[in-house]
């Protein structure tokens, strides 16, 4: 509920920014880049474990604008998971790093201010791999695992506002639903609040 309240406040702020943005430039390229970061709750599962914790993510994406209201994206995402609570399995500290390659489509659902701000929906598929996984148990022993591969479906809804002809600012609520795991550990994101800046060439 707190995330939803923050999101509504951000939505109102972004809408006000969009009102003062410039009109579209018909000479813009179909290509662009996007840099984003998110934070929120996540669950790490695998090998009979189900650990709830916090995650922070960064992403670097390339965008192809098929139309003014729809774009395709791919790139690299990196997720950091941490959990510091005692569980029934006596694990009290968990850290994991995952890298992902998404392929998704983002399209405008409705315009809030014509050609200035819009509500957007994003959905796709993402291949993820654990590049580091570490557990610390109650007796201070440690174990490290890597190589876990799993597929997920990233979903997001948010609001985007044009700051200028080239720059767009976006705020989103996002998640990743895990669909398949080929090896041990999987990371499922829940209730992420994401901010991103896009630049269209």
Name each model-derived stretch.
Residues 22-31, 68-70, 110-119, 163-167:
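Short loop/turn motifs that connect adjacent beta-strands in outer-membrane beta-barrel proteins
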Residues 29-31, 50-56, 93-101, 117, ...:
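Residues that define the transmembrane beta-barrel architecture of outer-membrane proteins
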Residues 34, 119-125, 172-174:
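Extended hydrophobic secondary-structure segments that form protein cores and membrane-embedded regions
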Residues 79-86, 96, 144-146, 150-201:
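Predominantly the C-terminal beta-signal and adjacent terminal strand-loop region
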């Amino acid at each position: 509920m707190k995330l939803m309240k923050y999101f509504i406040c951000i939505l109102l702020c972004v809408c006000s920014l969009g009102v003062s943005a410039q009109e579209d430039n018909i000479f813009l390229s179909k290509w662009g880049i996007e840099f984003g970061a998110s934070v929120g709750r996540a669950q790490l599962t695998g090998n009979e474990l189900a650990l709830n914790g916090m995650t922070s993510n960064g992403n670097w994406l390339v965008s192809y604008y098929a139309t003014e209201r729809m774009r395709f994206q791919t790139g690299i995402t990196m997720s950091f998971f941490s959990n510091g609570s005692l569980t029934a399995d006596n694990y009290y500290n968990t850290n994991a790093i995952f890298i992902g390659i998404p392929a998704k489509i983002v399209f405008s659902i409705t315009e809030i201010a014509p050609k200035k701000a819009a509500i957007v929906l994003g959905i796709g598929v993402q291949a993820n791999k654990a590049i580091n996984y570490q557990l610390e148990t109650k007796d201070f022993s440690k174990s490290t695992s890597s190589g876990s591969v799993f597929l997920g479906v990233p979903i997001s809804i948010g609001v985007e506002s044009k700051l200028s002809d080239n720059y767009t600012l976006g705020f989103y609520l996002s998640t990743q639903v895990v669909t398949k795991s080929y090896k041990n550990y999987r990371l499922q994101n829940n209730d992420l609040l994401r901010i991103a800046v896009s630049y269209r060439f």
